[in-house]
Amino acid sequence: MPGGEGENRVGEGIQSLKQLHALPWDEKTENEMLRSRLDEQSQLICMLKQRADETQIKWQHLERVNGELERQSGEAAQRFQSERERGERLEERFAILASNHQQMIRFKDEYKQQNEELRQLCDTMRESKYPELLHRDRCIQELRDQLGDTETRLKEQEMNYGRKLDTLSAKVEQLEGEKRTGSLELGDLTHRLKVSEETRHEAQEKLARLEEIKKAEKAEADKRLEEIKKEKQELLNLCMERGRTLQDRQREAAELSVRLQEAQKSLEKAEESYQRDKAAVDADIRVSDLQRKLEDGENQFEQLRRDFEAYKKHSGDLLTKERELNSKLRHLIG
């Protein structure tokens, strides 16, 4: 029974060594993981560049809007100046019409004064001597006739002047209406110009704020870019360090593989020696020797397994650190 149990344990140890030796080393997967992470870094840098381009496009659009507002402000100022000149011309024409109206009033007053003087002259002539009065009556009659003609002409002229005055009054009212309309238009244009100035001032303030925001975003983007470059350099250093560590681990794995092969050969030799010496040596002593060798082989196998687990843990720590760096880069970009 002890001999059969020893043979089973030797067979199980050999089978475990064969399974460990058959474990694959996937270097291609590791290279693809490294390449995938480098691609992620390139995508993050492209996203930063795209945001910088979008900020530049917004800045150009605001410059075009500011130029359009300045053009509209200039046009409003020109219209305001034109309406102001038109109002001044209307005021000049109104002053001329008012002066003509005053002249017509003075002419009418002068006519009334002359008429009154003629009447007084007639009364004075009546109080003179009779012959002279008769003579003067004739003269007065003639003068009356002349006065009638003159009055008729004056009435005609007064009517003409009245019509002209009505026409001029209508024109004056029209000009006053135009002046009021011009004043309203001038007030509207003044209000629109004021609104345009306020809009332009607000646009300039907004543009100044956007310039400050752009400068701040540019500084922040430069700062983030520097941080990303620093993180990228650290990542590259980490990748290089990991590559060197990977090469060391590959070399260690190769050494472990050689040691596993040697251990397997030792176990195979032990099994062959056990088979050769099985018939000649006492079974219990040989089994004890084989058990000791098997325990040595198991101890070597356990040591190799612990080394392999330590390597896997170190690789996992490197991968976790790399993921944390990628998450930090995404947080900076986002």
Swiss-Prot record:
Record-linked InterPro entries: CCDC89-like
Predominant localisation class: cytoplasm
Ranges in coiled-coil conformation: 75-318
Source taxon at top rank: Eukaryota
A GO term from the CC aspect: cytoplasm
Keywords: Coiled coil, Cytoplasm, Nucleus
GO molecular function terms listed in the Swiss-Prot or TrEMBL record: protein heterodimerization activity
Intracellular or extracellular location(s): Cytoplasm; Nucleus
Family: Belongs to the CCDC89 family.
Subunit relationships: Interacts (via C-terminus) with hey1/bc8 (via Orange domain).
Name of protein: Coiled-coil domain-containing protein 89
Name of the encoding gene: ccdc89
